[in-house]
Every structure is written in C-alpha cells, then in structure tokens.
C-alpha cells in the first residue's frame, strides 16, 4: 500500500495515549539532524523504566543504546540520563531519570519501506532496535503531559484526572485546540462568572 503513495516521512503513532505534542517540532528536529529515524521519548523514573523501551543518547540526542523493558539493575543503571544531558534538557538534579520510548516514531520513507519488506513482526523488539543500530536515529525529548491509557487502570485514572477541577491535561488550551466532531467536544467551561 505504501509503495503507491509519495511521501518523505512516515509517522507511527500509538492510539492509546493522551498527550498534546507539537509535531512540527519533532519533524523539524528530524530534518535538522538529517535523521533516518526519530523516536519521541519522555523522562521516567527508575520504577517506570522497566515497563518501557529505554534509550541512552549522546549530547546531540543521537540514540546510542536501546533496551526494551530492561529488568537487570546493572543494565538499568547504565541507561540513566547523564548529568550533562539532564542539565541540557532542564530536567533538574534527580539522578534516577531515564528516557522512555513513547511509541511515537518518524521514519524516512526508504527506511520504513525497507523494514516493511523484512521478516520482522514486532516493532519494539525487532524493528526499533535494528533501526537504531543501522540508521541515523535520534531522540526527540518531550517534556509535556503524556499518559499511556492502554490499560483499564491507566484509562480510568486519566478519566478521573480529566474530571478534576484542574486536570493535568488541558482540554481548553487556546494555543493547542482539539479538533473533532461537534458531538465529541469537551463540556462547557465558564471562568470568572457569578451565578445568582
């Protein structure tokens, strides 16, 4: 199917996440770095690191190592974000931070077509590690709100948060509107009004 369409870049997006990312920044960094693959990442703590693909990047944000759901303490330690990189990213002094794959990727056309024609069947276990090994692969570090809502628990908790007075995810941000069909618009919100 992809062979019949002309495109330069292909996005892989997960359908079970809640976030508000400016994709123009991701593609801008991808082009600037002359990347073949860009992986969106988010800083996570040590406890969460075992549930994600974790990567180590250099000062230019090029991915140097990738481990899918690391379990061994020594391996996890080796993937910790270095102090210099934490400072460059403005992440603060917490030493136990790791860069987790968000399941959001940008591929150059030729690279994606090569992997689609391969025998690989699992994206996280086969394609991403091989692409990082063989291609110019970079991390786009996202520091906004992101929640994986792929389990009943996380979906439920995200819905409870969305119903709170000040939810972590802002559905009413005028700088980042949510475009959808009218029947799916968020509820009305009234600020600074007095009701008699």
Model-flagged regions — what are they?
Residues 1-4:
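A structured beta-alpha segment of the ubiquitous adenosine-cofactor-binding alpha/beta core
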Residues 10:
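Short aromatic/hydrophobic "clamp" motif used to bind/position activated sugar donors
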Residues 13-14:
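Active-site acidic Asp-centered loop
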Residues 17, 45-46, 145-146:
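Short histidine/acidic/glycine/proline-rich micro-motifs that form metal-
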Residues 17, 105, 152:
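Gly/Ser/Thr-rich beta-alpha loop segments that engage phosphate groups in nucleotides
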Residues 20-106, 118-119:
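Conserved core of the sugar-phosphate nucleotidyltransferase
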Residues 84-95, 109-196:
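Left-handed beta-helix
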């Amino acid at each position: 199917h992809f062979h019949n369409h002309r495109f330069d870049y292909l996005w892989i997006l997960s359908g079970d996440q809640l976030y508000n990312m400016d994709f123009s920044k991701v593609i801008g960094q991808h082009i600037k770095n002359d990347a073949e693959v860009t992986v969106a990442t988010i800083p996570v703590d040590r406890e969460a690191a075992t549930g994600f693909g974790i990567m180590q990047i250099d000062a230019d944000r090029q991915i140097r190592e990738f481990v899918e759901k690391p379990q061994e303490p020594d391996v996890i330690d080796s993937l910790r974000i270095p102090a210099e990189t934490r400072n460059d990213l403005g992440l603060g002094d917490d030493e136990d931070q790791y860069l987790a794959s968000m399941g959001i990727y940008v591929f150059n056309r030729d690279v994606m077509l090569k992997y689609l024609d391969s025998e690989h069947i699992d994206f996280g276990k086969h394609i991403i590690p091989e692409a990082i090994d063989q291609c110019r692969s970079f991390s786009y570090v996202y520091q906004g709100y992101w929640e994986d809502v792929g389990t009943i628990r996380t979906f439920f908790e995200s819905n409870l948060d969305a119903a709170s007075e000040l939810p972590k995810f802002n559905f009413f941000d005028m700088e980042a509107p949510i475009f959808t069909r009218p029947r799916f618009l968020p509820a009305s919100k009234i600020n600074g009004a007095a009701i008699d």
